[in-house]
Amino acid sequence: MNIGMVGTGSIAHTMAKEFARLTTMPVVAVYSRSADTGVAMANEFHIPKVYTEYDEMLADPEVELVYIATPNSLHFEQAKAALLAGKHVLCEKPIVPTVAQLDELLSLAEERRLHLLEAITTIDHPNYGLAKLFAKEIGSIKTVSCTFCQYSSRYDAFMNGQTPPVFDPAYCGGALM
C-alpha cells in the first residue's frame, strides 16, 4: 500500500523514518503548503512526488493511504477529503475534536470500505512488555489501569504567557484538549 504524507513537521519526519523501514508500504508522495519544505522532505526521505495542492495528491491513483500529520484543527477536513477520494487514512492524534466529526468519518470509511486509524503508539510502549512479564508473577490479570504522560517543553512556553498551538482551542489543542 502506497503512502501519501500530509505535513512536514517534526512528527511527520519521525514517521517518515519509520515508514522508510517498511518494504511493502513506500511513501510515494508528500503534501506541503510550502514547496520548499515539501521538496526538502522529499529529498531527505527519497519521496518521488511533492504536492502543494492537497486535492492533487488525493487525485494521484498511486496514493492509497494518506498519513495526516498537520495541526489538529485540519484533521477533520483532510481526513474527510481523503476518504471521499477513496483513500485509507492514518491520522495523528487526536484524530478529531468532536464525537460528531468522528462519527461522520467512521460512517464515510464504513460506506466506502476504507480503513480509518488514529496514529497512537501506546500498544508498542515498553510498559506493556513489563505488564506481561509481571503477569507471570502475579497471576491472571482482571483489570489494568494505566496513566501515560510526557513532559512537553511547550508547557514552559505556556507558563511564560505564550499560547503554543497545543494549548490553543482554535487549533483544537493537543491530545488532552
Regions found by a protein language model. Give the residues of each.
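N-terminal Rossmann-like dinucleotide-binding module
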Residues: 1-45
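Rossmann-fold dehydrogenase core element
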Residues: 104-121, 140-144
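Short active-site oxyanion
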Residues: 2, 25-29, 64-66, 116, ...
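Alpha-helical elements of Rossmann-like donor-binding domains used by nucleotide-donor carbohydrate transfer enzymes
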Residues: 14, 40, 56, 65, ...
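Residues at the C-terminal ends
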Residues: 21, 84-86, 111
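Predominantly a Rossmann-like dinucleotide-binding segment in NAD(P)-dependent oxidoreductases
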Residues: 122-177
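Beta-loop-alpha module in the N-terminal Rossmann-like domain of NAD(P)-dependent dehydrogenases
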Residues: 45-106
